[in-house]
Amino acid sequence: MKSKFNSYTFYVDSTQQTINFDSLDEVNEYVCDITGVSQNQVVIVDDVEEKGHSNVTVKDKFGDKMRVVGFVYGSRW
């Protein structure tokens, strides 16, 4: 599925930084790097393509607790 966005901006809650990425996969990899979780523990809601934004959450190793680590939104520029 082709994305309707050219780039994605990720706002990191802990550092209050914004970082630009070319794809949601890159956002996912970055979240793994900064949190130490595996890719299947990162949750970026699929409705980014519809709504244009989503919270980014990570699951703990048991999958029962989730915490928000930031916010991502798409850009057409």
What are these regions (language model features)?
Residues 16-18, 65-66:
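Short, mixed charged/polar active-site loops
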Residues 22-41:
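A short, charged, amphipathic alpha-helix used as a generic interaction element across diverse proteins
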Residues 37-77:
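Short, mixed-charge low-complexity intrinsically disordered segments
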